[in-house]
Design a protein with these regions (language model features):
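A general "terminal functional-core" signal
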Residues: 2-43, 47-54, 59-68, 75-84, ...
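Short glycine-rich His-centered loop
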Residues: 85-105
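Short internal beta-strands
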Residues: 89-91, 131, 271-273
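Short catalytic helix/loop segments, enriched in acidic residues and glycine
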Residues: 105-121, 350
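Charged, often glycine-rich, active-site loop that binds/positions anionic groups
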Residues: 134-159
Length: 399
């Protein structure tokens, strides 16, 4: 005989609650697992996207470096210079003559030829011994410059802005290419070649160049091409050099090369400049390894003492395989743009100190003439080179 047990209402309620709780927990677990799955999937996709982006960025960077290297290796600017020539580089194409318009800028655009003329007259240099460079091609310029920047130079207004002569904007660009930019490109070729000659002979002087306000993507201050940056990149690839010191003693801050080599540990920048004048580039100042400020009115003795101290600090911090010396003469007393009070003899002593610094440590040195806005600059530069020759810091005689 069977007996059926009828559950009490309490048991029924408990069972219903338990079943409901199980359903809720199961549903919640399902929702959490679904959410977790979506989160993992989304993170996986993001990770893949980031890795793909990073990989693409790395690949793009490697491609750009490879292209830069190929451009440098295919360049014709590294001429084989016979030993009958001295490592002093100049071409008559350096000088700018443009219907008198060049006189609207305070820069002496014929100083380069006048420097060589003084050296020849002083019998320190034989005209036949001067090295003539090639013009930097577009492919050469693309080693540092962007295509966009080079294309911007096809606009006369842009060129006028860079060389700071507003009326030039009214001229056809083809004229500016021939009369202004062509001379600049020849000087760029000279600066690039100077590094090769310095490595071979111990020193080289480009009687031109030093366009230190121009970076890869921006020109200004009478500087249309970044010859210093180009020179250094060529040296990295063609000369197997890995450490370069820039000693920039122009009165103005060298903001162009500072931006190009921002955070590049291969390049040490010593920049001694007047902070009260153009270009007021505070971002670029962050990338100067040793900043030496010389305010308006600084005199010769004070200047030379600061230079001596700066050179000692530099060599104690960095061991260069090449020095690029930007030897602007706009520090001369009377130069309205530099606003310093350095005597002509002070310039001679300054250059001697820098060349002695390089010679004592057996470091190849490239000298660029850079800025200088007085007619007397050409004579001062020539006299300084004569002094370097007399002190046997350079040899301008034929072998």
């Amino acid at each position: 005989m069977s007996c059926r047990v009828i559950p009490s209402s309490t048991d029924f309620t408990r069972n219903l609650y338990t079943a409901t709780l199980v359903c809720v927990i199961s549903f919640a677990t399902f929702q959490v697992s679904q959410s977790l799955y979506r989160h993992i999937l989304r993170n996986s996709r993001n990770r893949h996207r980031i890795m793909s982006s990073s990989s693409a960025s790395s690949s793009s960077k490697n491609d750009a470096e490879s292209l830069r290297c190929n451009r440098i290796l295919s360049s014709k600017l590294y001429l084989d210079v016979p030993t009958s020539k001295v490592p002093l580089i100049y071409s008559p194409t350096y000088d700018i003559s443009f219907l008198g318009v060049e006189k609207l800028h305070p820069f002496d655009s014929s100083k380069w030829g006048r420097i060589c003329g003084f050296l020849i007259a002083a019998r320190v240099l034989d005209k036949k011994c001067i090295v003539e460079p090639l013009e930097a091609s577009k492919n050469d310029l693309l080693v540092v410059h962007t295509e966009q920047y080079l294309n911007s130079l096809k606009n006369s207004t842009k060129v006028a802005e860079i060389i700071e002569v507003p009326p030039v904007a009214l001229f056809p660009n083809c004229l500016l290419q021939q009369k202004v930019l062509y001379p600049f490109r020849n000087q760029v070729g000279g600066t690039i070649l100077a590094a090769k000659l310095a490595k071979e002979r111990g020193w080289a002087i480009n009687v031109g160049g030093g366009f230190h306000h121009c970076s890869g993507g921006k020109g200004g201050g009478f500087c249309a091409y970044a010859d210093i940056s180009l020179c250094i990149h060529f040296a990295f690839v063609r000369l197997n050099i890995s450490r370069v010191m820039i000693i920039d003693l122009d009165a103005h801050q060298g903001n162009g090369h500072e931006m190009d080599f921002a955070r590049d540990s291969r390049v040490y920048i010593l920049d001694m400049f007047n902070p009260e004048i153009y270009p007021f580039d505070y971002e670029a100042r962050r990338y100067i390894d040793q900043k030496v400020e010389v305010v308006s009115g600084t005199t010769t003795n004070v200047y030379l003492k600061k230079l001596e101290e700066a050179l000692e600090v530099a060599i104690g911090t960095f061991d260069p395989e090449l020095i690029v010396y930007n030897a602007g003469t706009d520090i001369l007393d009377g130069d309205s743009l530099g606003r310093l009070k350095i005597s002509p003899d002070g310039i001679t002593t300054r250059d001697e100190k820098v060349f002695s610094f390089a010679r004592e440590r057996n470091i190849p040195i490239v000298m660029l003439t850079s800025g200088g806005y007085m007619k007397s600059s050409a004579r001062v530069i020539a006299d300084s080179i004569v002094n370097l020759s007399k002190k046997r810091l350079i040899d301008t005689t034929k072998p």
